[in-house]
Amino acid sequence: MALEAAGGPPEETLSLWKREQARLKAHVVDRDTEAWQRDPAFSGLQRVGGVDVSFVKGDSVRACASLVVLSFPELEVVYEESRMVSLTAPYVSGFLAFREVPFLLELVQQLREKEPGLMPQVLLVDGNGVLHHRGFGVACHLGVLTDLPCVGVAKKLLQVDGLENNALHKEKIRLLQTRGDSFPLLGDSGTVLGMALRSHDRSTRPLYISVGHRMSLEAAVRLTCCCCRFRIPEPVRQADICSREHIRKSLGLPGPPTPRSPKAQRPVACPKGDSGESSALC
C-alpha cells in the first residue's frame, strides 16, 4: 500500500502527527458495536467494503485511491470508485495514515452522500489497526474518521512491543495447518495486539489481523476468513485490482484488464466456533 519516499518530514511535523494520533486514539472502540458482529453467521451483514492505494510505478507522488463495496456473503462487487491522487506527505513508518487516509476518507464521504444505500457496514483496510507503534494504525485512523467498523489486514508482521519474526514465530506459522487456524500476537506489554491467520488452504503465509474500530478481534478474524476466496480478503483484493486497472487506463498503459475472481471460488460458510490459538475458524 505504501511507497517509501526519499525525504522525511521535519521533526515538528512528526510531533504534530503523534499528537493527532494520540487525540484520535482516545475515540477507538475495540469491541463489537453491531448485532451482526455477534452473530455466528454474521446475519444482518450485507455489505463489506475494502480500500487500497496503488502507486504509479517509479513515482512516489502519483497514486490511485480505491473504494469497493461487495455484497455479503456472495462477495460480488456492487460499487467501485477510483481516483488518481497526488500524495503530498512522505511515507514514514508508523504514519501511513497521514499519507493515504485523506483520499480514502473522501471516497467514503462521496459514497455516503451520493449512494447511502450502498454504504459498507464494515471496512477491511490494507494495513494495521491497534497493531502499531503507538496503537493507532491506518485502520484505526480511517475507522475513527468515518465512524465505521474497520479491520486491519496486514500481509507482513509489524515488529512492535517485542513481536519478532523469529524462529519461534515461524514455528507457530508452520503449525497453522488449515484455513482458519490462528494464533494470538502477544506483545511484551501483555496485550494481544492481533492474530496471525491462515486465510487459505493453498497459502502458508498468514495475514496479521488487528482491530481498527468498533469491532472485536474475534469478530475481525472470523469476518476476514469469511471474505477470503484467496489469501487476501476479497474486499481488499478487489480494491487493489480496481486501483491498478484505473492507473492502467488513466495512463494509457497496455495490457488487458485484470480479471475478476470467478464465482466458483467462494469461501465456505462462516464459522460458528470461537477463535483461539490454532483453532479452525472457517
Swiss-Prot record:
Name of the protein this chain belongs to: Endonuclease V
Keyword Coiled coil applies: no
Keywords carried by this UniProt record: Cytoplasm, DNA-binding, Endonuclease, Hydrolase, Magnesium, Metal-binding, Nuclease, Nucleus, RNA-binding
Named cofactor requirement(s): Mg(2+)
Signal sequence interval, chain numbering: none
Positions that bind Mg(2+): 52, 126
GO molecular function terms attached to this record: DNA binding; endodeoxyribonuclease activity, producing 5'-phosphomonoesters; magnesium ion binding; RNA endonuclease activity, producing 5'-phosphomonoesters; single-stranded RNA binding
BP-aspect Gene Ontology terms: DNA repair
Cross-referenced Gene3D superfamilies: archaeoglobus fulgidus dsm 4304 superfamily
Region span, Disordered: 250-282
Assigned EC number: 3.1.26.-
Effect on the protein upon substituting residue 226 to S: No significant effect on activity
Effect of residue 52 to A: Abolishes ribonuclease activity
Keyword Nucleus assigned: yes
Quaternary structure and partners: Monomer. Interacts with PABPC1; the interaction is RNA-dependent and stimulates ENDOV activity.
Effect seen on changing residue 227 to S: 68% decrease in activity
An example Gene Ontology CC term for this record: cytoplasmic stress granule
Effect of mutating residue 228 to S: 46% decrease in activity
HAMAP family on file: Endonuclease_5 (MF_00801)
Organism: Homo sapiens (Human)
